[in-house]
Amino acid sequence: MTAARLGALDPTVFELAARRVMARCDELARITSTPGAITRVHLSPEHARVNRLAAEWMREAGLQTRQDAAGNQLGLLPAADPEAPVLMLGSHLDTVVDAGRYDGIVGVLMAIEVVRLLQRRDDDTSGVDAPARSPFDFGLEVAAFSDEEGARFGKALLGSSAVAGTWDDAWWELEDPDGTTLREAALEFGLDPGRVSEAARRPSELVGYLEAHIEQGPELHARGEPLAVVSSIASARRFQLVVEGEARHAGGTPYDMRRDALLGASEAALAVERICSTQHHIIGTVGQFEAFPGAMNIVPGEARFSLDLRGEFDGERDRVWDQISRELDDIMGRRRLRWHTREVHNAPALFCAPLLQDVVGEGIRSTLVPGSAVDGSILGSGRPEDPTTLFSPAGHDGMAIGAITDVGMLFMRNPDGVSHHPDEAVSLGDVALGIRALAEAVAHLGAEHRRT
Ligand SMILES: [Zn+2]
């Protein structure tokens, strides 16, 4: 199918598809471990239920379904050549605790609609319904990843890491807050931990990975634009920091004798804000903060806090960490405190593949600039309608999948930019535009592929 032919589709099909997506987001939101809120974590009974429902919707859209060895739900629309590689489209169905209903979920449901819109059924004279197949040289596969958020075991991207073949067997011993190990949870879910490597895909099996996701910030809303191409996913480092001072009597210890660990840590948290807020695309967050022994009448002798540091570029991020470290030396030296840290996470930035950025851009242009897909007239006009490109400070499944194939992403406007919160939102109209842009992007990639 060509982009032009897709453009000839009645625009109401995209709205109908978006209505189905929104209704299904509502339906999935009711599958939760916490009534009145949305919480759906890895390998839970809720995970099993949403996989079954997603599989049903995939089959109804003509896809061949299976759940892989890591609990990811997959749906395949094969190419005419069964050996042909596939373009993977998807996102995740797990949530954080007390989540919104769109983060991840909307991307999976949009992928199902896109495959439904693009598929071809060959004429069959026998009167039997011919199986649906991909109209491109490559198959289309919808992936609903089982764990992106890491809400249960503290380790994110478990589902997509298994697909990428970067699974670490040490993860089996990770425990959830109830002391259940990942291994025990997998067995209870019906998975065989010894077979997790079967979920891994070879690079040669894939053409690439495309994901639609709500923006988890306010940038598109502020610009008054519905869609953006994602250029890269943030690099991130996470640290647990400990400040050591001396616990002493709150009444009997004069200020000049105090070595108050909490005050040193507080100054450090403020320094993180001061340093990061003056840097372009560097975000530092202190999200956990504790004082010990934690009594009202004792000067805190120890403080512990976390630091989440993200950046568009690894080098810039590392330079800022060096600057923060020097500042901490200074603060703690002045206050006669000691500090040390343990790095608990380090992921490089993931740059979206130029070709996939191009096709997502073409998809957006075809969607927002009527006629541009058909006659290419915009090509000679300096592209005044160049789609917005954003870097994603939030993590996504593409960070893991990037280990085996090219990654591209499409962002949709999120009013107020609220995410990981029940107020998370996206409009029906923007989802309709997003479905069309994603379908156009796939069609553009199909045309590119044929050419090469
Ligand atoms: Zn997400």
Model-derived features: positions:
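Active-site-adjacent substrate-binding region
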Residues: E15-A18, A29-R30, T181-S231, A269-R274, ...
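N-terminal capping segment at the start of a domain
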Residues: T2-S44, W171, E343
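A non-catalytic alpha/beta surface segment that caps or lines the substrate-entry region
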Residues: S33-P78
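Alpha-helical metal-binding/catalytic segments enriched in His/Glu/Asp
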Residues: L89, D98-E148, R237-V243, H249-I275, ...
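A short beta-alpha structural unit
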Residues: T39-L43, T285-G294, S306-F313, R338-D358
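His/Asp/Glu-rich mid-to-C-terminal helical/loop segments that flank catalytic regions of hydrolases
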Residues: S231-I233, H249, T253-T278, R326, ...
